[in-house]
C-alpha cells in the first residue's frame, strides 16, 4: 500500500494501460493529486485526480484505470 507522501512533484502519472496522462504538480490534503498544466496532455489547464485512483507508486504514479477513462473523469481547474 502506498502513502500519499510517496507521490512526489514531477513524477509521471500513467494509466493502467501504461499510457502517460500527466505529471504531478502536488498533492492536496492526501486526497487528490494536482497535475501540472504544462504537460502535453494538459491543454494548458491543471487537472485533479482522486488519490483513490492510484494503484501503486514506484518511479511513476500508476493509476487503477486506463488513461482515456482517467482523462474523461479528471477535474479541470481553470
Residue map of PLM features:
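Peripheral interaction segments used for macromolecular assembly
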Residues: 1-78
Amino acid at each position: 500500500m502506498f502513502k500519499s507522501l510517496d507521490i512526489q512533484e514531477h513524477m509521471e502519472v500513467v494509466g493502467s494501460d501504461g499510457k502517460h496522462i500527466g505529471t504531478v504538480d502536488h498533492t492536496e490534503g492526501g486526497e487528490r493529486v494536482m497535475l501540472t498544466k504544462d504537460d502535453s496532455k494538459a491543454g494548458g489547464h491543471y487537472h485533479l485526480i482522486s488519490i483513490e485512483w492510484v494503484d501503486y507508486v514506484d518511479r511513476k504514479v500508476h493509476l487503477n484505470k486506463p488513461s482515456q477513462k482517467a482523462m474523461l473523469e479528471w477535474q479541470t481547474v481553470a
